[in-house]
C-alpha cells in the first residue's frame, strides 16, 4: 500500500519541464522548488516582481524564461545556475546585471531586451559560449569594450539604443552572422568592419552615418544590408565586391551616384534607393540580372539608361517624383514587370514598346504631361489599374482611339487626357530620331493589332482577339511591399494646376518611436479641427462638375488683389528639426501656382500645427529675405541653403490680402483645389511633405 503513495512523489521528482506562463502569478509558486531536477522553467507573461532565492537552488536548470514580468532586480545568486544555457529577461525593469553572471559559463542565449540598462558589466563577456545576445530597446550608451571576447557570438542585436560608438573589438567576432545596430546615434563604423567575414545580415539604419568603410566589401557573405535613414553621400567604390548581396536598402540618404562596381552585384534582388540625390542611374544597373524590385522615387533622375531593359526578372519599378521626360524603348524587354510607377515626372509620351510588358498589372503615370497613351496599351491584357490622375476614382478607365496628327499614328485617350500641362504636339525628349524610332515600331513584327477601326474598348468586346475587359472596378492600388520601409503617403491628394517641382524643408534629425506616435495623434487632431472650421470637403465630384467648378475657381483667383504688407517671421524648428513648409517658383523654375507670372519664391504649403504655421507663416506669402539673404532673384536651392543654416529661421515675407494662393480661406471647390490632408501623420514617412497625390505602393 505505501508503494502506491510513494509513486506519485517519485514521478514528481522526475519532472524536468514546467510551463506556468500567462498564469497571472504574483510570485513563483512554492511547489516548483520541490522539483530538484527541473531543467526548463517558463514563467513568461506574469506579474512576478522578484525571484525567490529558492529558485537558485535548482542547480539542474538549463532554460529559464522570466520575460514580460515586473522584475526590477536580478539577484547575484543567478551565478549559482551554472548549467544555464538560455536566460530570457526580456521586458522587465532590470537596470543592472550582477557580476556573478560570469559563472554561467554554458550560457548560449541571453535576452536582455526592453530593460533600462545603461551599461553591461565587462564580466558578461567572460561567458564565451554565448551565441545569441539581444540588447534591443535598452538605454545602453556603450557596449562592453571587450565584446570581441564573445568569440562564439553569431547574433548580436542592439537596436533602438543610445549607442554613439562601437567598440573596435567587435571586428574580432569572426563567427558573427547577424548584426543589428539600427536606430542608434552612430556617426561612424569601425574601419575594419570587413573582418566580419561570416556576416550575412547587417542593419545599421536610422543612425547618423556619413559614409561606410571601404573594408565593408570584405563581408563577402553579406546578403542583407540596410543603411537607410542616414546621411551618407557616397557609397564605397568596391561595394560590388559582395557577391552574395541580395537586398540593399540605401533609402533616405544623400547619395549622389551609385558606384561603378554596382553591376557586379549579380545576385541583387531588391534595391531601395528612394529619397536620395541621384541625378543619374548608372548603366551598370543592367548587369544586375537577378533584380526583381527597384525603387528610385524622389530623386533627381532625368532619364533611365537603356540597359534597364536587360533586367528580365524585374517585377516592380518605381521612379516616382523625379524629372523623367521619357522612358527608354528597352522597357519593353522587361517581360516580368507587373508594377510600373512613373508618377509625378514630366513625361510627354510613353514608348510604343510598353505593350510588350505582357505581365503588367499596374501602370501609374499620374501627374505627368501626357497628351495621350500609345495604342499598344490595348494589348496589356493583365492590366488591373491604370492611374492617370490624383482625382481618379476608378482603377480602370474607358479608353477610346484617336490619332496623333503630328505623327500620323493611332493613339488612345480618355477624359483625363491630355494631362494637366500637356503640350500639344511637343514632347521633351528633344530628339527627332527618338520620336521616329518609336513611330516606326507601329506595325512591327512583335506587336500586332487585329482591329484598326476607331472604336472604344467597350465596342471591341466582340473582336476576334479579345482585348480584355477595361471596365473593371474597385481594383485596389498595390499594397506596400513586404520590405521594411513604408511608403511616403497613403492619401489620394489633389493635383495642382501648373505645379512646378516642389521643395520640402525637412531636417535629417529623427524622432524616437514614442515621440513620433504622440506627434502623429496631435497632427491628426489639428487637421481634423481645421477641416471642420473651414468646411473642407473630401468628396469626389463628377468630371463635368469638376470642369465647371475649375472655371469658377480660376475666375475667382484672378480677382485676388488688395494691399500688400511686409511681415518678419521667426520660426524655431521643432524637436524633429522640421519647419513644415513648402515653396515653389524661383529664378530657375516655372512661376508658382496662382502667382500671376511672378518669378519670385512663394510659400505653397504650410502644414497645420507645424512650427511655420504657429509662427504665422501663410500660404501665398512671397519670400523677400531668409536669414539675411536676399530672396528677390533667388532660386529654390538658394532658399534651401539659407534656411538650413540656422535652427531659428527668420523670414521676411510680402503678404497680399487676400492671399494669391490661399487654400484654407475657402472650402474646397473641385479636384484641382488644395485640401489640407497633405500627408499621413501615421505613416512611417510622414516627415516628408507631399504636395500632390501620391498613392504610393512601393515600400
Curated annotation (Swiss-Prot):
A biological process term (GO) from this entry: adherens junction assembly
Biased composition annotated in UniProt, kind: Polar residues: 659-676, 684-699
Signal peptide range: none
SMART domains the UniProt entry points to: LRR_BAC, LRR_TYP, PDZ
Deletion phenotype: Worms display a severely affected epithelial integrity, leading to abnormal morphogenesis of the pharynx, intestine and embryo. RNAi-mediated knockdown causes defect in the apical junctions between cells, electron-dense structures are observed which are discontinuous and greatly extended along the lateral membrane, or absent. Results in polarity defects and strong cellular adhesion. Disorganizes the ajm-1 containing apical junctions in embryos.
Domain of life: Eukaryota
Subcellular location(s) of the protein: Basolateral cell membrane
GN (gene name): let-413
InterPro entries attached to this UniProt entry: Leu-rich_rpt (IPR001611), Leu-rich_rpt_typical-subtyp (IPR003591), LRR_dom_sf (IPR032675), LRR_R13L4/SHOC2-like (IPR055414), PDZ (IPR001478), PDZ_sf (IPR036034), Synaptic_Scaffolding_LAP-MAGUK (IPR050614)
Tissue distribution: Expressed in the terminal web of the intestine. Expressed in seam cells. Expressed in the basolateral surfaces of epithelia and the nervous system. Expressed in the intestine, epidermis, excretory canal, reproductive system including vulva, uterus and spermatheca, in both larval and adult stage animals.
Membrane topology: Peripheral membrane protein
This protein's GO CC annotations: basolateral plasma membrane
Disordered, as annotated region: 656-699
PDZ domain boundaries: 584-665
Entry similarity comment: Belongs to the LAP (LRR and PDZ) protein family.
Entries under PANTHER family matching the protein: DISCS LARGE, PROTEIN LAP4
Keywords carried by this UniProt record: Cell adhesion, Cell membrane, Leucine-rich repeat, Membrane, Repeat
Organism: Caenorhabditis elegans
Predominant localisation class: membrane
Protein name per the record: Protein Scribble homolog let-413
This protein's record includes keyword Transport: no
Function: Critical role in assembling adherens junctions; adapter protein involved in polarizing protein trafficking in epithelial cells. Necessary to maintain, not establish, the entire terminal web (organelle-depleted, intermediate filament-rich layer of cytoplasm that underlies the apical microvilli of polarized epithelial cells) or brush border assembly at the apical surface gut cells. Required for correct localization of ifb-2 intermediate filaments in the terminal web. Required for dlg-1 and hmr-1 lateral localization.
LRR repeat windows: 37-59, 60-81, 83-104, 106-127, 129-150, 152-174, 175-196, 198-219, 221-242, 244-265, 267-288, 290-311, 313-334, 336-357, 359-380, 382-403
Phosphoprotein among keywords: no
Amino acid at each position: 500500500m505505501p508503494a502506491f503513495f510513494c509513486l506519485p512523489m517519485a514521478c514528481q521528482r522526475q519532472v524536468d519541464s514546467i510551463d506556468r506562463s500567462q498564469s497571472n502569478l504574483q510570485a513563483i509558486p512554492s511547489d516548483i522548488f520541490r522539483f530538484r531536477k527541473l531543467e526548463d522553467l517558463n514563467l513568461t507573461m506574469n506579474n512576478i516582481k522578484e525571484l525567490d532565492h529558492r529558485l537558485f537552488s535548482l542547480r539542474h536548470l538549463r532554460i529559464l524564461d522570466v520575460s514580460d514580468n515586473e522584475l526590477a532586480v536580478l539577484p547575484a545568486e543567478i551565478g549559482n545556475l551554472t548549467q544555464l544555457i538560455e536566460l530570457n529577461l526580456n521586458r522587465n525593469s532590470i537596470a543592472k546585471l550582477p557580476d556573478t553572471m560570469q559563472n554561467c559559463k554554458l550560457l548560449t542565449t541571453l535576452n536582455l531586451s526592453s530593460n533600462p540598462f545603461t551599461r553591461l558589466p565587462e564580466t558578461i563577456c567572460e561567458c564565451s559560449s554565448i551565441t545569441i545576445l539581444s540588447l534591443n530597446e535598452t538605454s545602453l550608451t556603450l557596449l562592453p569594450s571587450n565584446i570581441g571576447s564573445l568569440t562564439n557570438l553569431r547574433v548580436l542585436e542592439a537596436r533602438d539604443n543610445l549607442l554613439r560608438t562601437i567598440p573596435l573589438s567587435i571586428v574580432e567576432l569572426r563567427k558573427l552572422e547577424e548584426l543589428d545596430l539600427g536606430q542608434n546615434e552612430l556617426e561612424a563604423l569601425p574601419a575594419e568592419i570587413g573582418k566580419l567575414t561570416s556576416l550575412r545580415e547587417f542593419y545599421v539604419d536610422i543612425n547618423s552615418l556619413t559614409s561606410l568603410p571601404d573594408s565593408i566589401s570584405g563581408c563577402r557573405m553579406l546578403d542583407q544590408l540596410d543603411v537607410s535613414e542616414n546621411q551618407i553621400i557616397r557609397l564605397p567604390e568596391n561595394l560590388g565586391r559582395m557577391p552574395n548581396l541580395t537586398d540593399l536598402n540605401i533609402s533616405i540618404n544623400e547619395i549622389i551616384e551609385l558606384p561603378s562596381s554596382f553591376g557586379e552585384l549579380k545576385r541583387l534582388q531588391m534595391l531601395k534607393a528612394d529619397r536620395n540625390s541621384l541625378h543619374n542611374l548608372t548603366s551598370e544597373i543592367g548587369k544586375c540580372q537577378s533584380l526583381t524590385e527597384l525603387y528610385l522615387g524622389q530623386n533627381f533622375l532625368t532619364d533611365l539608361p537603356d540597359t534597364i531593359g536587360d533586367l528580365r526578372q524585374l517585377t516592380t519599378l518605381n521612379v516616382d517624383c523625379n524629372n523623367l521626360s521619357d522612358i527608354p524603348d528597352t522597357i519593353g524587354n522587361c517581360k516580368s514587370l507587373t508594377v510600373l510607377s512613373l508618377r509625378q515626372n514630366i513625361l510627354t509620351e510613353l514608348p510604343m514598346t510598353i505593350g510588350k510588358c505582357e505581365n503588367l498589372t499596374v501602370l501609374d503615370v499620374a501627374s505627368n504631361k501626357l497628351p495621350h497613351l500609345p495604342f499598344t496599351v490595348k494589348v496589356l491584357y493583365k492590366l488591373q489599374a491604370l492611374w492617370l490622375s490624383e482625382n481618379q476614382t476608378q482603377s480602370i478607365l474607358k479608353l477610346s482611339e484617336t490619332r496623333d496628327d503630328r505623327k500620323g499614328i493611332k493613339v488612345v485617350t480618355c477624359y483625363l487626357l491630355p494631362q494637366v500641362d500637356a503640350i500639344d504636339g511637343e514632347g521633351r525628349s528633344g530628339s527627332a530620331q527618338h520620336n521616329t524610332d518609336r513611330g516606326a515600331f507601329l506595325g512591327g513584327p512583335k506587336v500586332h493589332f487585329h482591329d484598326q477601326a476607331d472604336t472604344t474598348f467597350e465596342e471591341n468586346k466582340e473582336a476576334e482577339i479579345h482585348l480584355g475587359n477595361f471596365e473593371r472596378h474597385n481594383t485596389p492600388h498595390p499594397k506596400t511591399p513586404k520590405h521594411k520601409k513604408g511608403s511616403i503617403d497613403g492619401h489620394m491628394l489633389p493635383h495642382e494646376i501648373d505645379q512646378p517641382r516642389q521643395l520640402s524643408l525637412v531636417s535629417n534629425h529623427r524622432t524616437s518611436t514614442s515621440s513620433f506616435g504622440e506627434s502623429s495623434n496631435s497632427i491628426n487632431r489639428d487637421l481634423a479641427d481645421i477641416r471642420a472650421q473651414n468646411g473642407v470637403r473630401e468628396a469626389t465630384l463628377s468630371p463635368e462638375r469638376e470642369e465647371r467648378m475649375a472655371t469658377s475657381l480660376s475666375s475667382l483667383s484672378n480677382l485676388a488683389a488688395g494691399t500688400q504688407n511686409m511681415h518678419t517671421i521667426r520660426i524655431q524648428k521643432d524637436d524633429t528639426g522640421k519647419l513644415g513648409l513648402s515653396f515653389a517658383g524661383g529664378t530657375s523654375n516655372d512661376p508658382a501656382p496662382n502667382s500671376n507670372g511672378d518669378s519670385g519664391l512663394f510659400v505653397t504649403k504650410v502644414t497645420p500645427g507645424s512650427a511655420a504655421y504657429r509662427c504665422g507663416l501663410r500660404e501665398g506669402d512671397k519670400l523677400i529675405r531668409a536669414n539675411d539673404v536676399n530672396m528677390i532673384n533667388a532660386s529654390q536651392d538658394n532658399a534651401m541653403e539659407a534656411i538650413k543654416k540656422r535652427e531659428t529661421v527668420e523670414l521676411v515675407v510680402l503678404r497680399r490680402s487676400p492671399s494669391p494662393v490661399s487654400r484654407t480661406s475657402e472650402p474646397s471647390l473641385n479636384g484641382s483645389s488644395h485640401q489640407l490632408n497633405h500627408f499621413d501623420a501615421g505613416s512611417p514617412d510622414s516627415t516628408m511633405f507631399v504636395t500632390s497625390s501620391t498613392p504610393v505602393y512601393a515600400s
